[in-house]
Amino acid sequence: MIEILVVSDIHLGTSVSQKEKVLEVLSLDFNTLLINGDLFDNYSFKRYDKRDWKILGKIRKLSKTHNVILVKGNHDSNAEFLSAITGMELLENYTTTINNKRFFFEHGDKYDHWIKHRPFLTWFFTGLYYWIQKFDRTHKTSRFLKRLSKSWIEAKDIVCKKFVEKHGKKHDVLLAGHTHHPEIKRFDFCVYVNSGSFCEHKCSYVEIYSDGKFELKYI
């Protein structure tokens, strides 16, 4: 039995979001659903298709029988309305203890110096990324550019380093999203886990069990 199902970076409203895979994962048996940031991407509902609304409907249904938590990401700044109608609890971060292990959840964008210090370039490249999506029906180019840009600015390593420096000594397991790079890194005093995203060809998520163990899964 999965105690906490952790997903992140679904980015509803974009064509690269792997929505069928999201629905498949949401059909697993779990007690708590924790969406670790960037469930949404665009608040123009004109860009939402039937599968986007189906996912939100699934979340709304789950919230009636499960704990459903949305930890805010940098694309979730105006998520209050949609979180309210879907029954999600909206938080900046989340901490819980399972079998004497302290788990800490935060999206990770706060530790991304690119967003913090270069907001205009962040806005520009995000716009370029979505423009390419319109013409790249296979999404291979847009995904490649996103992975390449993350590599150039070393976002995944910076996020991990700063995340661990701030929260590692107070918690046993740190869980982030944001970088779209699934990974597990073990340190002397904690473990850092990034759940990846649902915007790549191979999507990823994390299962946390009642004994405190966890797995990074791919679909």
Model segments located where?
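Hydrophobic secondary-structure block in the mid-to-C-terminal portion of proteins
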Residues: 153-188, 196
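Active-site environment of divalent metal-dependent phosphoester hydrolases
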Residues: 12-15, 40-43, 72-81, 110-114, ...
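Structural motif
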Residues: 3-4, 31-32, 101-103, 173, ...
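Core catalytic region of metal-dependent phosphoesterases/phosphodiesterases
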Residues: 7, 12-99
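Binuclear metal-dependent phosphoesterase catalytic core
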Residues: 96-99, 186-219
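Active-site-proximal beta-strand elements of phosphoester/diester hydrolases
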Residues: 3-11, 102-109, 191-196
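Conserved catalytic scaffold of divalent metal-dependent phosphoesterases
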Residues: 65, 69-72, 76-170
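Hydrophobic/aromatic beta-strand patches that form the interior of the parallel beta-sheet core
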Residues: 5, 34, 69-71, 104, ...
